[in-house]
């Protein structure tokens, strides 16, 4: 499948890279408003669904907000990629007409969805910071039974006391990784893939229950941090040939940078 790279932001290139990396269990996208997190996830999961025929579950804490938020992102993303004719958009489900795979949408207020997530290859947690820590622990334990299953989380800046900071980030060690993406054997130019940071957690020593030997597990989590400066539909593409320069949006962010740096 060929996708025009001019349809994607830097977040999208990293998502395509790590959605195809079976050593990565958790893909975390972190950044403020207008950084293109949710839309990039929608784009790349649609692409992956066409390519691998696997099912995805998209969740928010409360289901009532889904249709007007992340579900709409998927519809707009499919149209933007020129692939909407390859999907059937139903209430709470998007079905791929090419291979029968589904993208289901649900709130955590539907407890039955948590019990039956083992048949999904991917689970997306939109607005991750709205979920409680016990919610996340249940989800990560129940997503099992298939090789390469992944949880993709998007969230905005949080307080130092939030459980994501205390229980997920602070309990691991992190290191920066090169901001490089190779597609079809060709490394993309740096200006197309530059974000604020890309970090992975440290390898872990894990007991193999079959061999009773301690083995090293490769890093299983990647955190991609971006800002509005990495959204080509806010600041325009590096070469000026695609995307959109939103003068009013940029002016608003610049005002905050000068007058309200803590909020910025």
Language-model regions, residue ranges each:
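Phosphate/NTP-binding elements of NTP-utilizing enzymes
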Residues: 1-264
């Amino acid at each position: 499948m060929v996708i025009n790279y001019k349809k994607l932001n830097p977040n999208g290139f990293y998502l395509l890279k790590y959605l195809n990396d079976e050593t990565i269990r958790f893909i975390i996208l972190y950044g403020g408003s207008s950084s293109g997190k949710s839309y990039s996830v929608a784009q790349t999961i649609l692409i992956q669904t066409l390519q691998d025929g696997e099912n995805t579950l998209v969740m928010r804490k409360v289901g009532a907000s889904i249709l007007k938020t992340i579900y709409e992102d998927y519809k707009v993303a499919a149209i933007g990629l020129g692939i909407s004719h390859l999907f059937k958009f139903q209430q709470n489900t998007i079905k791929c007409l090419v291979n029968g795979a589904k993208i289901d949408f649900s709130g955590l207020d539907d407890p039955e969805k948590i019990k039956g997530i083992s048949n999904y290859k991917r689970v997306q947690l939109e607005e991750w910071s709205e979920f409680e820590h016990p919610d996340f622990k249940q989800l990560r334990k129940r997503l099992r039974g298939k090789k390469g299953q992944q949880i993709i989380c998007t969230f905005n800046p949080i307080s130092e006391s939030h459980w994501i900071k205390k229980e997920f980030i602070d309990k691991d060690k992190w290191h920066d990784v090169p901001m490089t993406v190779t597609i079809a054997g060709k490394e993309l130019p740096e200006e197309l893939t530059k974000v604020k940071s890309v970090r992975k957690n440290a390898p872990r020593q894990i007991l193999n229950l079959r061999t009773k030997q301690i083995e090293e597990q490769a890093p299983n989590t990647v955190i991609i941090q971006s800002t509005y400066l990495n959204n080509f539909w806010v600041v325009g593409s590096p070469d000026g040939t695609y995307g959109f320069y939103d003068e009013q949006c940029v002016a608003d962010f610049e005002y905050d940078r000068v007058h309200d740096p803590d909020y910025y």
